[in-house]
Amino acid sequence: MHKAGFVNIVGNPNVGKSTLMNALVGERISIATFKAQTTRHRIMGIYNTDDMQIVFSDTPGVLKPNYKLQESMLNFSTSALADADVLLYVTDVVETPDKHNDFVEKVGHMEAPVLLLINKIDLSNQEKLVELVEAWKELLPKAEIIPISAATKFNVEYVMKRVKELLPDSPPYFDKDQWTDKPARFFVTEIIREKILLYYDKEIPYSVEVVVEQFKEEAKMIHINAVIYVERDSQKGIIIGKQGKALKKVATEARRDLERFFGKTIFLETFVKVDKDWRSSDKELRSFGYQLD
């Protein structure tokens, strides 16, 4: 009998969802940084064996939206509750369980099995962990609570074991040689955006969208033209930097990661353009692939 299902990873920003996703799938599918709101889309990573297919989904962190981009991010997270065969709700040792949290309340009413994963236990002590387990038991009594460390991979194998046990009998949803639902261009944009998140401060990384305008693949080389969109002329100047040095650093570091990702020589050209207030424009958000409804 073949097993298959959707295993969706949800939780607040910066609790380690993307790191967990990469550890479970065994591939670097989601970008992971120390900054909140790194993930903007719902990203699938597909784990295949002869008799099993697990479709993991990494989702944006749950937050109260302040503009339309964040509304779209919340939509991705909420939709992950509806189609989950197994839900992985990720919290960490810093987060305090909140009985007034609407999203947690929705998780509590789910029919699908919920594994509540308390992440980053390598940064805590036993006493604090016991307190958190008891508090979460009270809040989500039906959930199975598992302490983990996605960074050190502590208990990640056990999480995978439980997922396999809970997965329903089903034929595969995707071809067995497919490892994600996203095209190559998507990973180019994410790797460039990751560098911007790492190298720029304050609001700059959150005001950026990356679009691949050309992706031309040859036998040993890929030619890529990418546009970095910002909301203000002042932001454009900051992204480019003095004598173009800041943008050059982003492009150089992104190119190295892209060469590792694709296993080919990368010729990368980057440009910076202003798209005023794109984060609040329905039209622009849809053109960038965000879900608004």
Whereabouts are the PLM-identified features?
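Conserved C-terminal guanine-recognition region of P-loop GTPase G domains, centered on the G4
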Residues: D51, N75-A143, K216-E218
